[in-house]
């Protein structure tokens, strides 16, 4: 497990160096790491989503497969995801921002590494890891938006002019839909399904005489309690991001006016 994680970590780091040197515009001086990372995240999100989806389809059938099943796709997904979070942790630590602003994302990276690392170590709960991992679909459109919003060196402006207004609006709409389906709906569904399975495994009369999951008695409190808590944390983070994305989508569609500097000064004077 560790050699594979190290391999993908160094591979991603190497690709980021190449993107920084040969693709990132020279005009970007400060946030070069972030720009290169946003480029790489588009194909990487597609890889993570497809491997997670493949594993979910294979492991969905029974209690035993959902809790004890392992596939090549589920292992690859978690390995690459851990590596990606290690790289993102380094990038976020290097970013010139107050530590207070970094804490939510650093917590996200740390909890993801620990949770998925636990799944790879025990060989259990791969389905639940991959079901959570379907949220990576949202990064396809999110990274495009972040690239377009790059203010340094007018890199974002150049991308916007190349892409065009229609595709930008379409990307924003798909981002909103993706966030709603793969985060706002997915995480509550994950929690509901998880607790139903736990109830069936430990709370039904049948479970006392015939365990639904052979070896299920070995599940630790970390797996049964901490994993749902991590998913709740992801849901709260996603909700906060969803509010911002909704406001951005409304502005893009013209339903919400963007505040000008003059309007902001007027409000300050009134206060």
Predicted regions located by residue number:
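Membrane-helix and juxtamembrane interface regions of eukaryotic multi-pass membrane proteins
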Residues: 1-132, 152-271
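Alpha-helical transmembrane segments and their membrane-interface exit regions
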Residues: 134-145
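C-terminal transmembrane helix end/exit motif
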Residues: 147-150
């Amino acid at each position: 497990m560790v050699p594979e994680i190290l391999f993908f970590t160094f591979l991603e780091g190497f690709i980021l160096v190449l993107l920084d040197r040969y693709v990132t515009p020279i005009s970007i001086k400060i946030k070069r790491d972030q720009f290169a990372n946003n480029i790489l995240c588009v194909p990487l999100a597609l890889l993570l989503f497809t491997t997670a989806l493949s594993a979910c389809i294979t492991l969905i059938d029974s209690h035993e497969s959902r809790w004890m099943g392992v596939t090549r796709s589920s292992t690859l997904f978690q390995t690459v995801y851990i590596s990606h979070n290690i790289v993102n942790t380094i990038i976020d630590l290097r970013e010139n921002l107050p530590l207070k602003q970094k804490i939510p994302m650093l917590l996200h990276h740390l909890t993801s590494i620990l949770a998925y690392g636990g799944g790879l170590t025990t060989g259990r709960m791969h389905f639940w890891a991959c079901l959570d991992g379907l949220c990576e679909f949202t990064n396809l459109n999110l990274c495009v938006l972040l690239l377009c919003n790059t203010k340094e060196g007018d890199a974002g402006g150049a991308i916007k002019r190349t892409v065009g207004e229609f595709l930008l609006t379409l990307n924003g709409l798909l981002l909103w839909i993706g966030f709603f389906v793969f985060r706002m709906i997915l995480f509550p569904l994950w929690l509901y399904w998880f607790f139903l399975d736990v109830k069936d495994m430990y709370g039904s009369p049948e479970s006392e005489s015939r365990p639904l999951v052979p070896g299920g008695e070995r599940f630790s409190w970390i797996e049964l309690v901490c994993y749902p808590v991590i998913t709740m944390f992801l849901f709260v983070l996603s909700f906060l991001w969803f509010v911002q994305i909704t406001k951005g989508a409304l502005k893009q569609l013209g339903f919400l006016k963007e505040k000008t500097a003059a309007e902001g000064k007027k409000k300050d004077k009134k206060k």
